[in-house]
Amino acid sequence: MQLPSFLDVYRGLISTSSISSSDPSWDQGNQAVIEKLSDWFSALGFDVDVTEVEPGKYNLLAQKGQGEGGLLLAGHSDTVPFDQGRWSFDPHQLTEKDNKFYGLGTADMKGFFAFIYEAAKRMDWKGQNKPLYVLATCDEETTMLGARHFSAHTPFKPDYCIIGEPTSLVPVRGHKGHVANVVRVTGKSGHSSDPSLGVNAIEIMHEVLFALMQLRDTLIKQYHNPGFAIPSPTLNLGHIHGGDSANRICGCCELHYDVRPLPGISLDGLDNLLRGALKEVEAKWPGRIEIVPLHEPIPGYECQHDHPFIHGIEDLCGTPSQTVNYCTEAPFLQQLCPTLVLGPGSIDQAHQPDEFLAFDFIDPTIDVLSKAMRKYCF
């Protein structure tokens, strides 16, 4: 049987929609793309296991070789939705133009599996003494369901892991976490001519905002990591809505905010800080303030700066590692083994109309992956 080419695999990945979204009208599941990956890696001699994590949501683990340790190459099989009407090309067809691949998932990050496939296809596996694993997860763009499930249930313990998010082939050794909450204030509506008739939720929210701003200052003073461009945790007030009319006492007000904690700040500790900041306001207004997570929190992540794995990958790439402010599945896979984020394409193209990956990344990415396989599986 003739094996598909790099371009065949790339086209197949992009043409197989696998959008995940908290909006049910967009959410599709990833079964079709997982089935294609299963066929392709099985044809290369990998042992493939597919796990249904939730209905319609699948993880794939492909294994080449036996033994302890080895290398895990990981990525997510889902994409974000796309902005209808704002793309110059069909987002679900791979378009080659101006020395770039255009399409949804070209950079973030289904296309990475085509690079793994091509590197594995070219590899001479004689002398392999440690396994190579390929992990394709579900729902990274929403809940990180696939990575959470894999790290909690896999019996395998690779020596090292590379996640192929778009980093322009610069190794990433750490990133901040992400916590997003809703604060809901329930007041009591009434006619604005007599404030005593109600409880104004906006006025209570004003006290909540003051407490959160004090917490933001505390986080900046107490936590600092010079390895990050923004060296302290950030707290952002992202969305607020309250009331419905100028002549009514506001009965409900809702705030969405997020915090991006540094590595080393525990999620439980951060939650205690957040709730402690609002303790006085809640005591003043019992039963009127509710805090609800927008999604499962994601911890910060950092691979130990002087770890030999970092130095090894820096040598392969010819560039020093760095830290970033966006999130990946690394905090969960790091629970299994030292983990770095390294992949083709730029994060600047992620989640954008006309997402693309430049042809300039093709040969260097295959080369780096081939060298990593050779270094950690032979």
From Swiss-Prot:
<keyword id="KW-0479">Metal-binding</keyword>
<feature type="binding site">
    <location>
        <position position="141"/>
    </location>
    <ligand>
        <name>Zn(2+) 2</name>
    </ligand>
</feature>
<keyword id="KW-0378">Hydrolase</keyword>
<comment type="pathway">
    <text>Amino-acid biosynthesis; L-arginine biosynthesis; L-ornithine from N(2)-acetyl-L-ornithine (linear): step 1/1.</text>
</comment>
<dbReference type="GO" id="GO:0006526">
    <property type="term" value="P:L-arginine biosynthetic process"/>
</dbReference>
<dbReference type="GO" id="GO:0008270">
    <property type="term" value="F:zinc ion binding"/>
</dbReference>
<comment type="similarity">
    <text>Belongs to the peptidase M20A family. ArgE subfamily.</text>
</comment>
<dbReference type="Pfam" id="PF07687">
    <property type="entry name" value="M20_dimer"/>
</dbReference>
<comment type="subunit">
    <text>Homodimer.</text>
</comment>
<protein>
    <recommendedName>
        <fullName>Acetylornithine deacetylase</fullName>
        <ecNumber>3.5.1.16</ecNumber>
    </recommendedName>
</protein>
<dbReference type="GO" id="GO:0008777">
    <property type="term" value="F:acetylornithine deacetylase activity"/>
</dbReference>
<keyword id="KW-0862">Zinc</keyword>
<dbReference type="Pfam" id="PF01546">
    <property type="entry name" value="Peptidase_M20"/>
</dbReference>
<feature type="active site">
    <location>
        <position position="140"/>
    </location>
</feature>
<feature type="binding site">
    <location>
        <position position="76"/>
    </location>
    <ligand>
        <name>Zn(2+) 1</name>
    </ligand>
</feature>
<feature type="active site">
    <location>
        <position position="78"/>
    </location>
</feature>
<keyword id="KW-0028">Amino-acid biosynthesis</keyword>
<dbReference type="GO" id="GO:0005737">
    <property type="term" value="C:cytoplasm"/>
</dbReference>
<feature type="binding site">
    <location>
        <position position="165"/>
    </location>
    <ligand>
        <name>Zn(2+) 1</name>
    </ligand>
</feature>
<comment type="function">
    <text>Catalyzes the hydrolysis of the amide bond of N(2)-acetylated L-amino acids. Cleaves the acetyl group from N-acetyl-L-ornithine to form L-ornithine, an intermediate in L-arginine biosynthesis pathway, and a branchpoint in the synthesis of polyamines.</text>
</comment>
<keyword id="KW-0170">Cobalt</keyword>
<feature type="binding site">
    <location>
        <position position="108"/>
    </location>
    <ligand>
        <name>Zn(2+) 2</name>
    </ligand>
</feature>
<dbReference type="InterPro" id="IPR036264">
    <property type="entry name" value="Bact_exopeptidase_dim_dom"/>
</dbReference>
<dbReference type="InterPro" id="IPR011650">
    <property type="entry name" value="Peptidase_M20_dimer"/>
</dbReference>
<dbReference type="InterPro" id="IPR001261">
    <property type="entry name" value="ArgE/DapE_CS"/>
</dbReference>
<dbReference type="InterPro" id="IPR002933">
    <property type="entry name" value="Peptidase_M20"/>
</dbReference>
<feature type="binding site">
    <location>
        <position position="351"/>
    </location>
    <ligand>
        <name>Zn(2+) 2</name>
    </ligand>
</feature>
<keyword id="KW-0963">Cytoplasm</keyword>
<feature type="binding site">
    <location>
        <position position="108"/>
    </location>
    <ligand>
        <name>Zn(2+) 1</name>
    </ligand>
</feature>
<dbReference type="InterPro" id="IPR050072">
    <property type="entry name" value="Peptidase_M20A"/>
</dbReference>
<dbReference type="InterPro" id="IPR010169">
    <property type="entry name" value="AcOrn-deacetyl"/>
</dbReference>
<keyword id="KW-0055">Arginine biosynthesis</keyword>
